[in-house]
Amino acid sequence: MLTVQEVEKFFMRPSGDYVFARWGRPIAAVVFGVLDESLSIIKSAVEAVCLASGHTTSELDPDIGSNLMVFFFKDWSELLEVPDLEHIIPNLEILLEKLETAEANQYRIFRFDETGGIKACFVFLRMDNALKKLNAENLALIQVVKAMLVWSDLAFQNASPLALRENGETVLRPEIAALLKAAYDPTMPPKSNDPSHALRMAARITVR
């Protein structure tokens, strides 16, 4: 379904470095800046993508309570008003200035455990016109997929991780679902910087 070279591209940095990491613990999500009905949509997306990946969710992380934090807002400067966020995100003001200058509409920050696996992810979404065009379900699914692994910055630049069925239902693209399943295979490491990891991933995708 995916060649080794295609798998590599999902995790290859512009520098030529191969960078892969997956979650090393159940995902406990919390969402800020949305109404209650949107909250349930996002949590349903987390559960659906974790189920497709073979990963798990939890109500609470024993160390930090919530380990996937998703923030929705209209302007980057709003994050300066979030209590204690500057303690979680180093050099927050400088980062926000860069994102504002670049007119970015999203940004993700990962934290890792001693094995190199993901232990926390912070997702920031500035709801510009491009993001507003997406319905809530699709936006939630896309963002959860992007938070499931440490992807290349270009991984989804030219194609969404979602596909539309003939009946109008939105689902993960089959190759993305297969890639996530391979990434969360218990025999695979939580982190790798070795391009041969892509070969092992591709082999697991092929046999499914």
Predicted regions and their residues:
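Short, Lys/Arg-enriched charge-dense amphipathic segments
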Residues: 42-53, 78-92, 177-189
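Glycine-rich loops and low-complexity Gly/Arg-rich segments
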Residues: 52-57, 93-97, 147-151
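Long alpha-helical, hydrophobic tracts
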Residues: 1-69, 74-78
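Short N-terminal segments
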Residues: 1-5, 90, 207-208
